[in-house]
Amino acid sequence: MSGRLEKEERAKRMMAAKLSELPAVFTAFYDWMDAREKSYTTMKNYINHVVEFKNFCDTRKKNEFYKKVTDDTIDRYMTSIRRKTVNGEIVEIGDDIRAAKWSSLNTFFKFLAQKKYIESNPMLLTERPRVRTDHTVTYMTPEEIESVFKKITDEARPMVKNRDFCIMAMGLGTGLRVSAIVNINVEDVDFVNNTIRVIEKGRKIRDIRFAENLRNLILVWMKDREIFFNGEPTGPLFISQKKGRLSVDSVEGLVKKYTAHLNKKITPHKLRSSAAMNMHGAGVDILTIASILGHNQVTTTQRYTSAYDEDKKKATDILDSLIT
């Protein structure tokens, strides 16, 4: 669990250096978001989006660029980011990206209005871009999952085979985000209660249940970790050959390699989708799935979590049956 905290502390130091080069209002905005427990990734994205907007604004007083902003300024900016030039070609910017940038500005101007930097909020006269949703979900079927594990067994190098198998199994068997998986420390794994304590998106601390097959895979990897990598009894659970914490990029590379034979693009997040879809296909209710995945969208999940403990165990067992 502390792995994520270590990473966030390093990132915050980098952000502090960046903020020192920006107008003071950015530091105030960052502190305002931090007090409201926004995730570091969210705060970083919001700052970057507002900096981009600041550069768009045509004003000599760059430190107080926000004071001359009107709803027309916002509309012109949103129009300007519909397209961009990449390698000499004009490409369309996705609705979701434009909506994210609008949300960043909306939060920024809400902050400005609350703190009396501005008299009126121009965002109130603008509209969030509509996002055209594609309801097609890419995920792996049980047969495809089996083929991926076979590929790891047949092709992975001996010293990383059990590590890679365990990472894929953990993504499929728990639905954890890859950022949470790489930040797990050995001491976060509780073999008595079969749980892993993680810090997830939005700084949520959760105890994730795992079943017997995954338990055995973790134990096998921990032996290899000690034998092949001279791993310490504490610290990062998943390490590279250089003994450092495995990165998100490294896991993305592993997933890409072991799923290359499938006729679909599988990313680490698709392991999460696969976990959800296979639970759904086995008849697990939506509240239980939302609770296991840590989704905020199902607002009643928190209320019913304790009542679904047994269902969550059954759901975990369903996912565990995919790991052979």
Model feature map: region roles:
Residues 1-324:
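Conserved catalytic core of the tyrosine transesterase superfamily
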